[in-house]
Swiss-Prot record:
Sequence positions that bind ATP: Q83, G101, E102, G103, K104, T105, D490
Gene designation per UniProt: secA1
NCBIfam families, per database record: PRK12904.1 (NF009538), secA (TIGR00963)
Molecular function as annotated in GO: ATP binding; protein-exporting ATPase activity
Organism classification: Bacteria, Bacillati, Actinomycetota, Actinomycetes, Mycobacteriales
One GO BP annotation of this record: protein import
Family matches, as CDD domains: DEXDc_SecA, SF2_C_secA
Keyword check for NAD: no
Organism of origin: Mycolicibacterium paratuberculosis (strain ATCC BAA-968 / K-10) (Mycobacterium paratuberculosis)
Entry GO CC: cell envelope Sec protein transport complex; cytosol; plasma membrane
Protein location: Cell membrane; Cytoplasm
Catalysed reaction equations from the record: ATP + H2O + cellular proteinSide 1 = ADP + phosphate + cellular proteinSide 2
Protein name per UniProt: Protein translocase subunit SecA 1
Function comment: Part of the Sec protein translocase complex. Interacts with the SecYEG preprotein conducting channel. Has a central role in coupling the hydrolysis of ATP to the transfer of proteins into and across the cell membrane, serving as an ATP-driven molecular motor driving the stepwise translocation of polypeptide chains across the membrane.
Mode of membrane association: Peripheral membrane protein
Primary location recorded for the protein, binned into one broad class: membrane
């Protein structure tokens, strides 16, 4: 119902976009007459008009006409009217649903150019580094032709290179890099370390993949914790010895494991411990669960691969390797132990944000995808984004065949290979979609046996992705690929002309960034030749039936299936698609597989005879809908809990930024001193009369905070009975506040003698930043610990979310109080020394980056500007080096979790590992006390 309501305004929006495209068309003749220099000068004209008060909406028709003409002159590609409509939808802050092959990348050039004129920056977000680099070079040619700077953010870049890229008018990069840079900026200790300059406008390519599929994936920057435990190896040894459905059970749908009583007894006997669930042994439960999950739920060459002794996660939606990403909650270490590779240290969360909350930082957000209607409700509810389906440039004539279902996987793959061989023999290109690296390599071996030339595209061959996809539409091409979702290169019948042309030019040593002039000249010379060759081959492919897409398994998301199908039939080309299924497929096993198997058994069909039935289609659709609803609920739940952290994060990050930007912090520091002293006094004088106050304890506490300069005896008068006379709490507080302010002034004078004027301001900044960071890290740990167990509140008929909000708020306020107290203590008591300021070396910027956005007069060298400081303060215990950081990914359910350390288990002294439970209990009773932890656990 919500989806229907959201689509009510589609007709009006399409009419509005059509009027925009028509208006842009009326300007075409005028723009075509302009010389290259005059076309480029339009950018300066638009910037001036915008600065004089003209809105970007007012400039839209002219700017789009100029960008459209520039694309034609530079790329030999003129955006169609439907692409202009899509571009307008993006500018107005919508998701443009454009089918595969309709030119989404070219469409993004127009709104990026228009919003780049505003000078506040445009972020074009892609799904991987390759596409970010490719688009910044390819589409960047248009922007540079028109006089705009273009930058690209890549994983290996230094902070100085990133700063140059962010200062460009248009910046390309991945969602992870943008998000991690935001987190790093909010961990910086100097303005010079900041790289981003705000969140103005984002265009998200494959928006459903990034904002929906990866929304369960919080971005986490972690630092090393206390160290890894040998328990991972011990439980990796035990897990294979335990039997499924005897020692434990597995729920594939929820992706959980549950240990039976027999399993608990088995582990206790193996480890030589008395009770797995007593407090001292409770960390072992997590090791056990992770070892069983690694055994049953995480499969090599599907969920991860092992390369060069390292476990690398494979994205379940795109099939790409997620370099640098690790499972949390000890899951990655459990998999490393299972695969017998080096177990890397566990991590502590330093900073985290969900992609949902990161992208909601942008003033304006838009996106492109070929499949958004199925997620329109979620995009509207979470991001306030409308979905506008853009008409195709030519009618779609692809034939989508009904699914074929086989009883066994073996029979299914035999049929797949036979079908592909038949298509290959008549010259029809085939794209086979698989769900795992293992399956793609199995099919590859079958094709080798049948001597069918083919390409394999999976996580192991990620680097060759663009080249493989670009030639997948050539005559007789056979391509085996895992999860075609998000593959940014078009499959064009006869071959991708742009890619093939670029490939030939690069073979000649030409590059669009390094040698732009020679590249442009050679491009226009080579392009017609490649076009002619590709057109002749495309004609043969069309006669053979166009691209045939063959899916070997249904994905849990209908969108992924639709994206795979959408690779065929682009721009009015003929094409065909079909899915081959079996009862052994994961989706069928998780949902409704038993009913289908019973039906096939009743029909008594041979294994190699498939069925086509509406029941199959309904069962698959029902299963996919259930999974999508589950995933939506998970994402909504993640967002609800992260919203609590998000409000707290905003407060902390705003405070850090204020400190970094150089505001005089003296008054804030003095206010902290007053607050802490007041809290101490209130605590000591809360109850009773003056004679009941424990001023000795108060003075002892205050002396640990700052050098108290007065004795309370001088503030009081004793009466005949020895009690205090006429001393009020207000008088006591006033005297102590004056004394604390005096002590602060004395401290400031001492520091200025050591390091000159402004030394106290420098110490205030260092102390506040370090205390904020340390307390925030501790708070993240505590909040994750709270979230981990908050679900149990439901057993007491309490709403876990409400409890999390309430306790999270109390913990946050307690953290702020602790922050004040710790800061005041450091300001008064930390030992400092003056050291020479470090010399600033010029930062060398690669020539390519200078082209992509560095000012011309820099000549390829950028020098970070810093205030001159002859000396700096070094505070012991404060100016510590930042810990080594890692950038980790999701746990298996996508929720944000922190890895924590466990302790060692306890065993009764003198009882060998492997003794029976009765023997261990008897030994414990004889000792009459708790057991001591052994130095190690012996194996049987």
């Amino acid at each position: 119902m919500l989806s229907k309501l959201l689509r009510l305004g589609e007709g009006r929006m399409l009419k509005r976009l059509k009027r925009v495209a028509d208006y842009v068309n009326t300007l075409s003749d005028e723009v075509e007459k302009l010389t290259d220099a005059e076309l480029r000068a339009k950018t300066d004209e638009f910037k001036k008009r915008h600065a004089d008060g003209e809105s970007l909406d007012d400039l839209l028709p002219e700017a789009f006409a100029v960008a459209r003409e520039a694309a034609w002159r530079v790329l030999d590609q003129r955006p169609f009217d439907v692409q202009v409509m899509g571009a307008a939808a993006l500018h107005f802050g919508n998701v443009a649903e454009m089918k595969t092959g309709e030119g989404k990348t070219l469409t993004s050039v127009l709104p990026a150019y228009l919003n780049g004129i505003g000078g506040k920056g445009v972020h074009v977000v892609t799904v991987n580094d390759y596409l970010a680099k490719r688009d910044s070079e390819w589409m960047g040619r248009v922007h540079r032709f028109l006089g705009l700077d273009v930058g690209v953010i890549l994983a290996q870049m230094t902070p100085d290179e990133r700063r140059v890229a962010y200062n460009a008018d248009i910046t390309y990069g991945t969602n992870n890099e943008f998000g991690f840079d935001y987190l790093r900026d909010n961990m910086a200790h100097s303005l010079d370390d900041l790289v981003q300059r705000g969140h103005n406008f984002a265009i998200v390519d494959e928006v459903d993949s990034i904002l929906i599929d990866e929304a369960r994936t919080p971005l986490i920057i972690s630092g090393p914790a206390d160290g890894a435990s040998n328990w991972y190896l011990e439980f990796a040894r035990l897990a294979p010895l335990m039997e499924k459905d005897v020692h434990y059970e597995v729920d594939l749908r929820k992706r959980t494991v549950g240990v039976h009583e027999l399993g608990v007894e088995f582990v206790e006997d193996q480890l030589g411990i008395d009770n797995l669930y007593e407090a001292a042994n409770s960390p072992l439960v997590s090791y056990l669960n992770n070892a069983l999950k690694a055994k049953e739920l995480f499969h090599r060459d599907k969920d991860y691969i092992v390369r060069d002794g390292e476990v690398l996660i494979v994205d379940e939606f795109t099939g790409r390797v997620l370099y640098g990403r690790r499972y949390n909650e000890g899951m990655h270490q459990a998999i490393e132990a299972k695969e017998h590779v080096e177990i890397k240290a566990e991590n502590q969360t330093l900073a985290t944000i969900t992609l949902q909350n990161y992208f909601r930082l942008y003033d304006k957000l838009s996106g492109m995808t070929g499949t958004a209607q199925t997620e329109a409700a979620e995009l509207h509810e979470i991001y306030k984004l409308g979905v506008v389906p853009i008409p195709t440039n030519k009618p779609m004539i692809r034939t989508d065949q009904s699914d074929l279902i086989y009883k066994t996987e073996e029979a299914k793959y035999i049929a797949v290979v036979d079908d592909v061989v038949e298509r290959y023999q008549k010259g029809q290109p085939v794209l086979i979609g698989t769900t795992s690296v293992e399956r793609s390599e199995y099919l590859s071996r079958q094709f080798q046996k049948r001597r069918i030339p083919h390409n394999v595209l999976n996580a192991k061959y990620h680097e060759q992705e663009a080249g493989i996809v670009a030639v997948a539409g050539r005559r007789g091409g056979v391509t085996v690929a895992t999860h075609m979702a998000g593959r940014g290169t078009d499959i064009v019948l006869g071959g991708n002309v742009d890619f093939l042309t670029d490939q030939r030019l690069r073979e000649r040593g030409l590059d669009p960034v390094e040698t732009p002039d020679e590249y442009e000249a050679a491009w226009h010379e080579e392009l017609p030749k490649v076009k002619a060759e590709a057109a002749a081959e495309a004609k043969e492919v069309i006669e053979a039936g166009g691209l045939y897409v063959l899916g070997t398994e249904r994905h849990e998301s209908r969108r992924i299936d639709n994206q795979l199908r959408g690779r065929s039939g682009r721009q009015g080309d003929p094409g065909e698609s079909r899915f081959y299924l079996s009862l052994g497929d994961e989706l069928m096993r998780r949902f409704n597989g038993a009913a289908l198997e019973a039906m096939l058994n009743r029909l008594n069909l041979p294994d190699d005879v498939p069925i086509e039935a509406k029941m199959v289609t309904r069962a698959i659709k029902s299963a996919q809908t259930q999974v999508e609803q589950q995933n939506f609920e998970v994402r909504k739940n993640v967002l609800k809990y992260d919203e609590v952290m998000n409000q707290q994060r905003k407060v902390i990050y705003a405070e850090r930024r204020r400190i970094l930007e150089g505001e005089n912090l003296k008054e804030q520091a003095l206010e902290m001193v007053r607050d802490v002293v007041t809290a101490y006094v209130n605590g000591a004088t809360a109850e009773g009369y003056a004679e009941d106050w424990d001023l000795d304890a108060l003075w002892t506490a205050l002396k640990t905070l700052y050098p108290v300069g007065i004795d309370y005896a001088t503030l009081t008068r004793r009466d005949a009975d020895g009690g205090f006379d006429d001393l009020t709490r207000e008088e006591l507080l006033e005297a102590l506040l004056k004394d604390a302010e005096r002590a602060y002034a004395t401290r400031e004078a001492e520091l200025e003698e050591i390091a000159g004027e402004g030394a106290m301001r420098q110490l205030e900044r260092n102390v506040l930043l370090n205390v904020i960071d340390r307390k925030w890290r501790e708070h993240l740990y505590e909040m994750d610990y709270l979230k981990e167990g908050i679900g149990l509140r439901a057993m007491a008929q309490r709403d876990p979310l409400v409890e999390y909000q309430r306790e999270g708020y109390d913990m946050f306020m307690a953290m702020l109080d602790g922050m004040k107290e710790e800061s005041v203590g450091f300001l008064f008591n930390v030992t400092v020394e003056a050291v020479p300021a470090p010399q600033v070396a010029p930062v060398q910027t690669p020539e390519g980056l200078a082209e992509l956005g560095a000012p011309a007069e820099q000549g390829g060298t950028a020098t970070a500007a810093r205030d001159e400081a002859p000396t700096q303060l070094r505070a012991k215990g404060i100016d510590n080096e930042a810990p080594a950081m890692t950038y980790s990914g999701p746990s298996e359910d996508g929720s944000a979790q922190v890895q924590r350390n466990g302790g060692d288990a306890k065993t009764p002294a003198g009882v060998p590992a492997g003794a029976s439970r009765r023997e261990r209990r008897a030994a414990a009773r004889q000792q009459g006390r708790g057991a001591k932890p052994p130095k190690s656990v012996k194996r049987r």
